[in-house]
Every structure is written in structure tokens, then in C-alpha cells.
Amino acid sequence: YPNEPVLYNISGACFAGLGQLDNALKSYEKALAIKPDYAEAHNNLGITFQELGQLDEAVKCYEKAIAIKPDYAEAHNNLGILLQELDQLDAAVKSYEKAIAIKPDYADSHYNLAVTFQGLGQLDEAVKCYEKAIAIKPDHVEAFNNLGSTLKELGQLDTAVKSYEQILAINPNFAEAHNNLGITFQELGQLDEAV
């Protein structure tokens, strides 16, 4: 059956979605036993290894997926997430930039790149990337929230307030935004609004 590797890959994703990571691993490995150059299965196997905390194995899987399919934006993004987790921030930046070069409208890569720049203290770059993620995905509340905190770090409190207010217009129950908005109002000396 020529579609058998695809079916194993799909069943692996289903098992992963159910939290049955050992079964997911087995399914991806079956797919790869039949079709060793199946980039998507290598990527999914990497995600599963990462969830299991087997980070070295995850790196190998993402790198294998990229070697097979160099224009695989999702694998570059996933490798970036893993490198970020390993505190290899400069390498993570390169992975996200590759993902964005391949897929310029990849909101998650712009967001992840922004988080990494924020971690590196490159706040102006982080702001640009958060804004790009939001331009692509206007309901990206995490990007708005982190944009607000970055603007706050830059001393742009009024603009940070606008960012938090935009989150609450999208999702009025986003508790972290309420908290951040209150703290920012307090820092602005607007105690009535802070309450």
C-alpha cells in the first residue's frame, strides 16, 4: 500500500493528540521503516521526543527532516523551539529566520523569534517581530501580551496599555492581560484604572 506511511504518520499524530506518546513513537517509526525519507514523520517524531524530554533525539529528527526537505518551515520552527529550550538562543534565531524566509506569513515563527530576541535583550527587534506576528494573526493574544511587556521594558507605558487593551477586546477573560494592564496603570500613576 503506497499510502501506508501516511496512515502511520496520521495515526501517530492521533496518538500524540491523545497523550499516548509511546504509541505515537511506534507509529512514526513504522512510517519511517517503510519510507525513511518521510520528512513529516521525522518532524512529528521530533515533536514527540521533545515532549518526552529526549531532546538530543528530537534535534536529530528535526535535522533529518530539514536535510530531506530543506524548505520545511515547520521543522525549522520546531528546531528553533528546541534550541530555545536548550538556551541556544543565537542558533534558535537562525532557525526561526530560516522558517520565515521560507514562509514569510508564518505568525508562530515571528512570535517565537520575538520571544527569543526578548530573551537576548534585543527589545526593538522583539517589538518588530511581535508586531509582524500580530499583523499576520490579529487575534494572537500571546503576541499582544508579550508586545505589551516588551514596550513596558522599553518605558513605553502608554503603548503597552493599548496592547493589553487590544488583548482584552479579543479575549476579555485573559487574566494575565488584566494583571499586566493593572500593573501598568499603577506605574503610570492612574490608580483608579488600575483597580
Regions found by a protein language model. Give the residues of each.
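Leucine-rich, hydrophobic repeat-scaffold detector
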Residues: 19-25, 34
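Low-complexity/repetitive intrinsically disordered segments
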Residues: 34, 68, 183-195
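Conserved alpha-helical positions within TPR/SEL1-like repeat arrays
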Residues: 6-17, 40-51, 74-85, 108-119, ...
